Amino acid sequence: MSLCGARANAKMMAAYNGGTSAAAAGHHHHHHHHLPHLPPPHLHHHHHPQHHLHPGSAAAVHPVQQHTSSAAAAAAAAAAAAAMLNPGQQQPYFPSPAPGQAPGPAAAAPAQVQAAAAATVKAHHHQHSHHPQQQLDIEPDRPIGYGAFGVVWSVTDPRDGKRVALKKMPNVFQNLVSCKRVFRELKMLCFFKHDNVLSALDILQPPHIDYFEEIYVVTELMQSDLHKIIVSPQPLSSDHVKVFLYQILRGLKYLHSAGILHRDIKPGNLLVNSNCVLKICDFGLARVEELDESRHMTQEVVTQYYRAPEILMGSRHYSNAIDIWSVGCIFAELLGRRILFQAQSPIQQLDLITDLLGTPSLEAMRTACEGAKAHILRGPHKQPSLPVLYTLSSQATHEAVHLLCRMLVFDPSKRISAKDALAHPYLDEGRLRYHTCMCKCCFSTSTGRVYTSDFEPITNPKFDDTFEKNLSSVRQVKEIIHQFILEQQKGNRVPLCINPQSAAFKSFISSTVAQPSEMPPSPLVWE
């Protein structure tokens, strides 16, 4: 680390130990590469990622209909037509108007699309008497991802021209179980307030309840994810690894403080933007922790490679330690650029884990089902081979391997917590870099950097899921969700709805959910 970085480090540590202090602020040069570049720790990043303008690519925002009311005049009166990126364009950046600029002149939209969009705006007036002012259409642009329980597209918000992500939650009201799961995810997305956890910026206006089948959630648009970065050919510096791991654990500490288990932490669910800010996403499998150990929990969780041994061994009760196991697997994958435990089946998955950690004690297997214990005890007794972790890469230093070994502990009660992992010295440089040039919680002044009083905040009160206890029918949940969405509407913003006449929308509507191969595999039935 440079002298400047070391100086910032000393000041940051002073802030970490209790006062606010400052570090020199400078200018950040933008790099256009697949792998986001980290700003040096002593420089301040002045720009929000949404404000990166990519040369040679214009954002097309089409005004559709001018409203004359003063409320409408205050809002941007435009319906967004797709700002299509050239298929050959490689950069993962999305254009948007610079701060304070109106969207530039757009290519003319086909007349029928304009007419259809205008008709849609009108059509929504009588349906939503609670928002008499107006509504704006949002038009899908291109698919950017398929989660376990939804499809994600990039869109342009017609109110400010910003690029955002639109997630379609399909088949919401098929049965009571899917209703509850979607409502839980929706409530979580609206509850989260943390820079390393994806949250809802907005929810599109629902139609009349009789036509209410899908839910559309607007979130920040992220350019990549950790899976794409890991499999890319670009080298990952130890600084990248530290700042990514720091943010994963920072987000996880917040989730766990809310009493939430994510239950599907994997590289593809860790979104990364163009300046390396990371956000945990996809809460389709998340739930509140179960404190009553006699209550059974579902085992259909976590993609196999990242699945903790207690789940593989059929434990009917598990804790947030399952997420830490997944983070350990990802940490090793960041270091070695390959999946740590890449097995063909759940039984082989368990065998690969015991090859590394050695045969677990009976105490460590106390929550396992009898069939799983028998499988372990039938096999040969294995010695641990943890020193092999040093061969992952030259970045697998003593500090790195020490932290990794605290995460990859067979017994979940002895596995390190997110809070304690964040206090590990390996992450000091990641914390420094994040808070001196990447975060939104600290800021730079003419005299230097002013640090937040709490580098890794938690939430209080916890996320409350008691609302689920009283949900008894699909129609009842549908009405409650419909009302919940209407209540979420921020009063100061024009409500958004989709233009159902557009070709892009029809493609979006018909886009399918993840194929079965992408779903977490079914649990192993131990004999």
UniProtKB/Swiss-Prot annotation:
EC number: 2.7.11.24
Region named Sufficient for interaction with DAPK3: 1-125, 124-416
Compositional bias ranges of the Basic residues kind: 26-54, 122-131
Catalytic residues of the enzyme: 264
InterPro entries hit by this protein: Kinase-like_dom_sf, MAP_kinase, MAP_kinase_CS, Prot_kinase_dom, Protein_kinase_ATP_BS, Ser/Thr_kinase_AS
Chain segments carrying region Required for homodimerization and kinase activation and localization to the nucleus: 428-527
Note on domains (UniProt): Contains a TQE activation loop motif in which autophosphorylation of the threonine residue (Thr-298) is sufficient for kinase activation. This mode of activation contrasts with that of classical MAP kinases, which contain a TXY activation loop motif in which phosphorylation of both the threonine and tyrosine residues is required for kinase activation.
Stated name of the protein: Serine/threonine-protein kinase NLK
Organism expressing this protein natively: Canis lupus familiaris (Dog)
